[in-house]
Amino acid sequence: MSARILALETSTLSCSVALFDGNACVHAEQRCEEQHVHASNLLPMIDAALKAAGWQGSDLSAVAVCAGPGSYTGLRIGTSTAKGICHAQSIPLIAINSLEIQAYHVLNIGPLHVGSTVLAVMDARRDEIYTQAFRWSGERFDALDKTRALVIDASAALDALFPQGTDGAIVVGDAAEKTQRLLKGKASGWTFIAAHPTA
């Protein structure tokens, strides 16, 4: 029997739940909210997902949860819920970087060349973003640097934002439009893709 994994994402305004049977997603639900209401949405979403798949909690092999960066309250809700399920079912908890999940959204628009560099950006409020650069290996994204919190404004040096070089950069995440706007045309030739991390 293949691994059955419950995936949770609560690091942004978007709250999502997905169930995987091996590599196949058998159920996914996402809600985007104006204000964080994950505490009231998450458990009903998990229950609905399990019912839709015909699974019980005891059928789960592991729970995967976004470990940040992101909203402190959202991360706390997701992590606490995941830990509770893992403890009750005696199954492992898998922590996943929220920015890495955002990087994978690039694959939704088409194939990516091996060696392509993607900058994942997440809104940290005001003129700040969380960011991390990744390189596509053909099978996965490999981190090129650590997660950073940056203030982005019109005078921001592109090298500080994207230390691996700026030619043909792909910027993806819920702060892609904000980053493009704040750079005020300094990022010509870059591709910006707005996306929320999802389970």
Placement of each model-derived feature along the sequence:
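N-terminal beta-alpha supersecondary unit
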Residues: 1-67
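Surface "functional belts" at beta-alpha junctions
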Residues: 24, 31, 37, 92-199
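Residues at secondary-structure transition points
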Residues: 33-41, 72, 76, 80, ...
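Short amphipathic alpha-helical face segments that pack within enzyme cores
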Residues: 41-45, 80, 84, 101
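Surface-exposed charge patches
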Residues: 48, 84, 181
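Phosphate-handling active-site elements
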Residues: 51-59, 86-96, 111-114
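DPxDG-like acidic metal-binding loop motif
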Residues: 64-98
